């Protein structure tokens, strides 16, 4: 993937480890088919990959709710992190303690089309 996405994976990984006072080094090779800077959640996917990698390094089980909260805190884009983790169309609302994620139902009569612009636009 793009080096910016790699930086997001690394930053989220290091941030997740640092919460437990840990550090790590090494090389990670990754790839993604999500177009970068096109509004499809590549940044959220990169952040979540870093968080999941930190869990794996520590030997901890996946915790989707905790991963979502960490991604929301790290990036602030719950609208992309929620569908990335939980699938489907999701609404994300700020909560007193943690963001509230709600699944939204879609009619089968609704179709989607997407055309990626030739130039990327950062949403961070």
Report residues per predicted region.
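Surface-exposed beta-strand edges and their flanking turn/coil or helix-capping segments
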Residues: 6, 41-43, 106
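DPxDG-like acidic metal-binding loop motif
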Residues: 40-62, 85-90
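ATP-dependent small-molecule kinase catalytic core of the GHMP/sugar-kinase superfamily
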Residues: 62-124
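Generic structural motif recognizing short loop/turn segments at the entrances and edges of beta-strands
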Residues: 24-26, 39-41, 88, 97-100
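Predominant activation on well-ordered alpha-helical scaffold segments within soluble catalytic domains
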Residues: 10-14, 48-55, 68, 72
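Gly/Ser-rich catalytic serine loop of serine hydrolases
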Residues: 33-45, 79
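ATP-binding N-lobe of GHMP and related small-molecule kinases
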Residues: 1-38, 56, 60-62
